[in-house]
Amino acid sequence: MSISMDQVKELRERTGAGILDCKKALTDTSGDVDAAIKILREKGLAAAAKKSSRDASDGRIEVYVHPGNKVVAIVEVNCETDFVAKTDDFKKLAYDLALHVAATNPSYVNREEVPAAEVEREREILRQQNVDSGKPANIVEKIVEGRIEKFYGEIVLLEQEFVKDPSVKIKDLVQEAIAKLGENIVVRRFSRFEVGSN
């Protein structure tokens, strides 16, 4: 089956991948654009994992001010070079992250920042809530672990569902940007301010 330039163009527009990568993915999937997107995403995420150990010391600080000037969020997002920091894709990622922080008010950037004592306290509360349910201990532990995942999703930025597209987690958004831009990207820190809150 021959692959048309229109198919390659459509795939490039949807993924940002190179022409040869798009053509190969389309050839491998017999022209199925959706399957080709999946292949390119998997390839990109594998490449992103390799880049995660590289130093990200450049970047930008993005500010989002909610209409009405009652909520503001500031996010520092780092990358490896100022060239990438100046791209529209990187600027959009930083803006989307700041908007997300303003909307969801997370407490931590990643799981590693959450104090172990806070996680254990939450586990204990969840165990107590389920102790009288009459369920076996191993089932209670599975319920508790599932709820701990939900707890992380409420307080950890990278574990949250993106407000503009709940089918995507923030960490996946960052991984996609790493794959597309070809550099390690790290959400370093954030702050959120709201009028009248402590």
Swiss-Prot record:
Protein name: Elongation factor Ts
NCBIfam families given in the database record: tsf (TIGR00116)
Organism the protein comes from: Herpetosiphon aurantiacus (strain ATCC 23779 / DSM 785 / 114-95)
Similarity comment: family membership: Belongs to the EF-Ts family.
Function: Associates with the EF-Tu.GDP complex and induces the exchange of GDP to GTP. It remains bound to the aminoacyl-tRNA.EF-Tu.GTP complex up to the GTP hydrolysis stage on the ribosome.
GO molecular function, one term: translation elongation factor activity
Domain of life from the UniProt record: Bacteria
Gene: tsf
Keywords noted in UniProt: Cytoplasm, Elongation factor, Protein biosynthesis
SUPFAM superfamilies: Elongation factor Ts (EF-Ts), dimerisation domain, UBA-like
Localization terms from the record: Cytoplasm
InterPro entries according to UniProt: EF-Ts_dimer_sf (IPR036402), Transl_elong_EFTs/EF1B (IPR001816), Transl_elong_EFTs/EF1B_dimer (IPR014039), Transl_elong_Ts_CS (IPR018101), UBA-like_sf (IPR009060)
Ranges for region Involved in Mg(2+) ion dislocation from EF-Tu: 81-84
GO CC annotations on file: cytoplasm
Main location: cytoplasm
